[in-house]
Amino acid sequence: LCLLLAGVFALLGMEVSSNHDFTWVYPLCILLEWAIITTLMVGLFFLFQRHGAAPAVLAFALFVLGIAEFFVITFKSMPIQPGDLSAISTAAAVAGNGYTFSISLFCVLSMGFTAIAMLLCEYAGLVAPHRQKGAVNAKRMLLTNLLVAVLCLGGVTAHVTLIDYYNTLGITVYTWRPLESYWREGYLPAFISAAQSIKPPKPADYSVDDAKATLKKYAKAYDLSLIHI
């Protein structure tokens, strides 16, 4: 229960900095985002043998992501998209040259939500049983923790890699107004959908040889048109 609530506050800690009007957010998208965050928290919790530090670090990392999103939106009125990750060094150099970093009240509110999430994670670690009497019981608990962690972390990995967010879930990032998509659908679902669209699926009848032949055909036709001119 503590981790379920921690997932809610971690989500708020990430989103509220830049997306504080939840009246137009799609409920199912936010529910999906909460499920992803909470499952990751549970997986880390059991991976580190029921200690709350790991999910607390995740909550803080999401807060940092939300603050970065706030600054990027303030700077260029666009969200952080998958393609931006290849230009982090350039963005940091530009931002460090005369750019004034000032936070808003919503950033402070996000900080409060993140603090609550981290406290809930630590409390979950305090109330959870850590040791069992006897070597057999201790080994059983260790294996159980690792199994739950693998199921949670592996489940999230399989979910974001195997499920087509665009065609199956209908989560669309509009090219001309991506910020609206991120605000309406939640940062993580929109980011995952955008990342999946970078590499489009290969058509069933696609052939490299046919593609090369088509290119040569068009190149030859273009060369002939130049000769006639």
What are these regions (language model features)?
Residues G155-D223:
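Membrane-interface segments at or immediately adjacent to transmembrane helices
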Residues I227-I229:
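Conserved small/polar residues in nucleotide/adenosyl-binding loops
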Residues L1-W176:
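Transmembrane and membrane-interface helices of multi-pass
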Residues T23, L224-S225:
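Short low-polarity hydrophobic stretches
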